[in-house]
C-alpha cells in the first residue's frame, strides 16, 4: 500500500477549526469528555501544522494514560503511531505500532500502517536509521498498560 494513503491524509481546515472550538468549549466547562478529546486529537494529527500534530499527540497520550477501555487504548496507540509518522518520528511510530501488534498480532490495519511507515521511511531515505532507544522508555510504559489491561 502506498504510504500516502494513510500518512498523507490531511484534515480540512474548517473541520480542524470546528474540532478546536468544540474542544475548547468543553474545556471551559471543565474536563472535556474522552470522545471530545479524541475527536480533537484526531483532527489535530491530520493538520499540516507540525505544532497541531504535536498537540494531538499530547491529547492522545493523556487519553492513553487515563482511559481504561481496551478498545479505546488500541485506537489511541494506532493514532499515536500515525501522528509520530506524520512528523517523521519513525522510531516512535514503529514502537507504538509494534506494541499494538504485540497485543493484536492479526491486526491487519496495524500491519498495513507498519508497512506504510516503512515505505515513508524509504521514501525519506531513512530506512534503518530509526533510533529505537529514545522511544523504548516511553513504550515500556505502553507495554505495561497493555499487559495490565489483559488481566
From Swiss-Prot:
GO biological process: apoptotic process; IRE1-mediated unfolded protein response; mitochondrial fission; peroxisome fission
Keyword line: Apoptosis, Membrane, Mitochondrion, Mitochondrion outer membrane, Peroxisome, Transmembrane, Transmembrane helix
GO MF terms held by the record: lipid binding; molecular adaptor activity
InterPro entries (alphabetical): Fis1, Fis1_cytosol, Fis1_TPR_C, Fis1_TPR_N, TPR-like_helical_dom_sf
Disulfide bridge partners, by residue number: none
Pfam families with a match to the protein in the record: Fis1_TPR_C, Fis1_TPR_N
Subcellular location: Mitochondrion outer membrane; Peroxisome membrane; Mitochondrion
Transmembrane portions of the chain: 126-146
GO cellular component, one term: peroxisomal membrane
Membrane topology: Single-pass membrane protein
Consequence of gene loss (knockout): Mitochondrial connectivity appears normal and also normal in a fis-1 mutant background. Abnormal, but minor, affects on apoptosis, with fewer cell corpses and an increase in cell numbers in a caspase ced-3, ced-4, or dynamin GTPase drp-1 mutant background. Increases number of ectopic cells in a combined ced-3 and drp-1 mutant background. Increases number of ectopic cells in a combined ced-3; ced-9 mutant background, which increases further in a ced-3; ced-9; drp-1 mutant background.
Similarity annotation: Belongs to the FIS1 family.
PANTHER family to which the protein is assigned, alphabetical: MITOCHONDRIAL FISSION 1 PROTEIN, TETRATRICOPEPTIDE REPEAT PROTEIN 11 TPR REPEAT PROTEIN 11
Function: Involved in the fragmentation of the mitochondrial network. Involved in perinuclear clustering of the mitochondrial network. May act, redundantly with fis-1, downstream of mitochondrial fission, before the fission products participate in mitochondrial homeostasis, mitophagy, or apoptosis. Plays a role in apoptosis by promoting mitochondrial elimination and cell-death execution, acting downstream of caspase ced-3, and perhaps independently of dynamin GTPase drp-1, caspase ced-9 and apoptosis-inducing factor AIFM/wah-1.
Domain writeup: The C-terminus is required for mitochondrial or peroxisomal localization, while the N-terminus is necessary for mitochondrial or peroxisomal fission.
Name this polypeptide is given: FIS1-related protein fis-2
Species, as recorded: Caenorhabditis elegans
Amino acid at each position: 500500500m502506498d504510504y500516502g494513503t494513510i500518512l498523507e491524509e490531511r484534515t480540512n481546515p474548517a473541520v480542524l477549526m470546528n474540532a478546536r472550538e468544540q474542544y475548547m468549549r468543553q474545556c471551559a466547562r471543565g474536563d472535556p469528555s474522552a470522545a471530545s478529546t479524541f475527536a480533537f486529537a484526531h483532527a489535530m494529527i491530520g493538520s499540516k501544522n507540525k505544532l497541531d500534530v504535536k498537540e494531538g499527540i499530547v491529547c492522545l497520550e493523556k487519553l492513553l494514560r487515563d482511559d481504561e477501555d481496551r478498545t479505546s487504548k488500541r485506537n489511541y496507540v494506532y493514532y499515536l503511531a500515525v501522528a509520530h509518522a506524520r512528523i517523521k518520528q519513525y522510531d516512535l511510530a514503529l514502537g507504538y505500532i509494534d506494541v499494538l501488534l504485540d497485543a493484536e498480532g492479526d491486526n491487519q490495519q496495524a500491519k498495513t500502517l507498519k508497512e506504510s511507515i516503512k515505505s515513508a521511511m524509504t521514501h525519506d531515505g531513512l530506512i534503518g536509521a530509526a533510533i529505537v532507544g529514545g522511544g523504548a522508555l516511553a513504550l515500556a510504559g505502553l507495554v505495561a498498560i497493555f499487559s495490565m489491561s489483559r488481566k
